[in-house]
Amino acid sequence: MNKRKVGSKNPNISSSPAKRVYSSPQAAMQLSAKVFLGLLKQNQGNLDLENCHYHVTEEVCIENEFSKFSIHLGCGVFEKSLSVEGVSLLRTLSLGSSTIKETLSLKTSHISTLNFGSAKIHGQASLDDITSNGIDFDQAHFNKEGSMKMVYSTGPLNLGEAVFESGLSLEDVGAESINAGSANLGKLTLKELYFGTFYTDSATASKLTIQGNKLSFRGNLLDTSRILTQLDSENLQDSLATRLARAIEAIKDLPSR
């Protein structure tokens, strides 16, 4: 009788990183950028799957080959930087509960739905030349500076419960509505903002600077009829409502020349 040896391996069975990525967090497979992008394409952009844990060891750039994809990053770890650049139409970008240990850069792309989930970004985070139908910072945590420049949403820009440890700057940013939520904005810098309504909600800022004066000012931030505040937040020193009201008043009180 021929006996089969228990535990023997078939040398013809593939053991590629992409196939072994589905495991426990403790055994998360380390992937190169090339293997990660291949895995992303193989799963049609969706890595938010049960028991899908991955660790990318190289810098990753998502480019126009992923146009028309909906990308859900799940709970991956990016040891280096993550960027999205030059994508003509990304239907969805959801960062899930991913961790990015260096920088996050979203540049020159249309992202229909952008959600930061509960992602943790250890390096600087920037959005530059981005159009969208809706942006939600959700519960994301930013250890270093966050910046938005030439960012336009035809829908809401929600700051949610996000935390910006080192501050946030917005320059040439437009949205149907800006909803500050209960975000901790740190040192907040505003320049050239366009919006239908600005809801300050219960958000806080350790400092707020509005760049520009009455002669050079662009945007509608000085139109206080568009800014809605909560009555119980107006008297709190660090509340966004208080900081914003004082900064706007200071600009209006400046001489015209």
What is the predicted function of each stretch?
Residues 2, 7-257:
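N-terminal leader/targeting and pre-domain segments
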